[in-house]
Every structure is written in structure tokens, then in C-alpha cells.
Amino acid sequence: MSPVNESLIDFPCDFPIKVMGKSHPDFQTTIVEVIRQFDGGFDAERVEVRPSSGGNYTGLTVTVRALNREHLDDIYRALTGHPMVKVVL
């Protein structure tokens, strides 16, 4: 039997995170600033941006360098706690 805390993810790794929020001119820049608090080498040029069909929401895919489970959890907490963010996957 495998240990309960064993992760299915091998760290460190590049981990894609999808972030969705209301469309706003500063949404992408703000999310990049949040990510850079945890990944100083994050390349903002690699952010994938997808507006919703109605243009009311924006979806971003950001690929972060996750060092361990706690690091990844901290990134998720910072994103989900941000007022501009509606959903993080």
C-alpha cells in the first residue's frame, strides 16, 4: 500500500494553471505579478489568453515552475484569494 501523502506529481515540474476572471485591461498583468511572487523567472510571454465568446471573461493559462506541493498550494491560494479571479483550475 502506498503512503497517503505520496504525490502523483514529480516535483520540481512545470505546471499549467488556468485562471479565469472578468475581462479587465489589467487582468493579465495582475495575474503575472501574482505568479512572479512565487516564480521569479516566470516568462509573461508564455501566457495563453482566451477571451470568452461574449467577451465578459478572460481565461489565462500560466505555466509555473512548482518546486514542491506546498509551493504549488501557495500559488493556488494566492490566485484564488485575489479579487479579480473567479476560478482557478
Swiss-Prot record:
Recorded superkingdom: Bacteria
InterPro entries, sorted: UPF0250_YbeD-like, YbeD-like_sf
Family that this chain belongs to: Belongs to the UPF0250 family.
Record NCBIfam families: PRK02047.1
Entry protein name: UPF0250 protein Bphy_0213
Organism this protein belongs to: Paraburkholderia phymatum (strain DSM 17167 / CIP 108236 / LMG 21445 / STM815) (Burkholderia phymatum)
